[in-house]
Curated annotation (Swiss-Prot):
Main localization (coarse): membrane
Membrane topology, record value: Multi-pass membrane protein
Organism listed in the record: Oceanobacillus iheyensis (strain DSM 14371 / CIP 107618 / JCM 11309 / KCTC 3954 / HTE831)
Record's protein name: Membrane protein insertase YidC
Top-rank taxon: Bacteria
Residues annotated as transmembrane: 59-79, 129-149, 160-180, 206-226, 228-248
Function, as annotated: Required for the insertion and/or proper folding and/or complex formation of integral membrane proteins into the membrane. Involved in integration of membrane proteins that insert both dependently and independently of the Sec translocase complex, as well as at least some lipoproteins.
GO biological process: protein insertion into membrane; protein transport
Length: 252
């Protein structure tokens, strides 16, 4: 678990290093320097711009279409991540039994703990690091989407539905928070490991309310184009979670 956490932290640091060297207010163009701009940001910006051109400069619709396209592209990785998480949840009771069995901190006991833990993983076909690959792939893409939307000048000059894409909106942040809450609530409904772990249950319940509020508040201060991206992504995730969890919820 620590190794997995370390990988995620390293990825966040790498993504921050790649994207942090670029001013978020600097427009993205074909001539923008750096690997981050060339490989990640500009291709997304180019795609949004060209899709908008198909729909008579409809940048709002283009953001929705590109967001759904990216989410569909990454859906197999999301499914893999969720299945890996469910597999880990199912073996949690046995894993806790092993941990209670070897409470001593001496080297010999810790070696036995590690050995039995690995045997449990192998017996149940669980790879504790399997959930890292989807995160490794997805995070740079999502950050690139953020940069592309914020740094494509044409987006801010257009409107969509009732809002100006370049200015903050007051309805989209509420929708963003609402669908973030729904998505997390659906994920929690099939998390069986929480019942045997009160501490984890408390943490998840806190995050259930804190995360939507944080994202909703952030959306109030960003251009509506970014909030539209978040709302679209969150709605997709709600339907994806329902689709993946449907067999599991039916069993209950």
């Amino acid at each position: 678990m620590r190794k997995k956490f370390g990988i995620i932290v390293a990825l966040i640091a790498l993504t921050t290093l790649l994207s942090g060297c670029t001013e978020i207010n600097e427009p993205i163009t074909p001539n923008s320097d750096g690997i981050w701009n060339t490989i990640f940001v500009y291709p997304v910006s180019w795609l949004i711009t060209n899709v908008a051109g198909v729909f008579n400069e409809g940048y709002g619709l283009a953001i929705i279409i590109v967001t759904l396209f990216v989410r569909l592209l990454l859906m197999p990785l999301n499914v893999k991540q969720i299945k890996s998480s469910k597999a880990m949840q199912e073996i949690q009771p046995k894993l806790q039994e092993i941990q209670k069995k070897y409470t001593s901190k001496d080297a010999n006991t810790q070696q036995k703990l590690q050995q039995e833990t690995m045997e449990l993983f192998q017996k149940n076909g669980v790879n504790p690091l399997a959930g890292c690959l989807p995160i490794l792939v997805q995070m740079p893409i999502f950050v690139a989407m953020y940069h592309a939307i914020m740094r494509t000048p044409e987006i801010s000059t257009h409107s969509f539905l009732w809002f100006q894409l370049g200015s903050p909106d007051y309805i989209l942040p509420i929708l963003t928070g609402l669908f973030t809450f729904l998505q997390q609530k659906l994920m929690m409904s099939t998390n069986t490991s929480m019942n045997s772990n009160p501490q984890m249950k408390l943490q998840m319940q806190i995050m259930l309310y804190v995360m939507p509020i944080m994202i909703g508040v952030m959306a109030f201060f960003f251009p509506a184009a970014l909030a539209l991206y978040w709302v679209t992504g969150n709605i997709f995730m709600v339907f994806q979670t329902l689709l993946i969890n449907k067999p599991m919820m039916a069993k209950k």
